Curated annotation (Swiss-Prot):
Binds 1 zinc ion. InterPro entries: ATP-cone_dom (IPR005144), NrdR-like_N (IPR055173), RNR_NrdR-like (IPR003796). The keyword Transcription regulation applies. Belongs to the NrdR family. GO terms for molecular function: ATP binding; DNA binding; zinc ion binding. Its cofactor is Zn(2+). The gene is nrdR. GO terms for biological process: negative regulation of DNA-templated transcription. This is Transcriptional repressor NrdR. Residues 49-139 form the ATP-cone domain. Keywords: ATP-binding, DNA-binding, Metal-binding, Nucleotide-binding, Repressor, Transcription, Transcription regulation, Zinc, Zinc-finger. The keyword Transport does not apply. It comes from Acidovorax ebreus (strain TPSY) (Diaphorobacter sp. (strain TPSY)).
């Protein structure tokens, strides 16, 4: 595998670990030229449902986009990357178990909100305030009151 730092073609695997649930393999690699280390992840290739956007467009499921949503909502919050990865894996498992060829983006948004609510209430409110497109402060206040219960 090519080194992401110097683009040298030869890297060596120095450590391999299987995730707790066995869903992926984490490998630490070291470049033979610059000696820097980096991490790669191996996952089985699966076919996720096509995402149907609000405007009717159909796009491929994108794990990185989902990860970006989590990172934005959880910015400067005390949640580890391991917790975020676990939440994304639970969402992906649900998407695969649906057995459908297509899924509405709004359904994915609901799954994200459910996971964020479990991880961090502030992140949940951040995400929901954008996702639900509140019209006024009363809708926002109702969400905060719901979270406080």
């Amino acid at each position: 595998m090519k080194c992401p730092f110097c683009s040298h073609q030869e890297t060596q695997v120095v450590e391999t670990r299987v995730s707790e649930d066995g869903d992926f393999i984490r490998r630490r690699r070291q470049c033979g030229a610059c000696d820097k280390r980096f991490t790669t992840y191996e996952r089985p290739e699966v076919n996720f449902p096509t995402v149907v956007k609000k405007d009717g467009r159909r796009v491929e499921y994108d794990r990185e986009k989902l990860l970006g949503s989590f990172k934005l909502a959880l910015r400067k919050r005390p949640v580890s990357t391991v917790q975020i990865d676990s939440a994304i894996e639970r969402i992906e498992e649900k998407l695969l178990n649906l057995g459908q060829r297509e899924i509405l983006s709004s359904r994915i948004g609901e799954l994200v909100m459910r996971e964020l609510k479990k991880l961090d209430k502030v992140a949940y409110v951040r995400y929901a305030s954008v996702y639900r497109s509140f019209e006024d402060i009363d809708e926002f206040r109702a969400l905060v009151d719901e979270v406080r219960k």
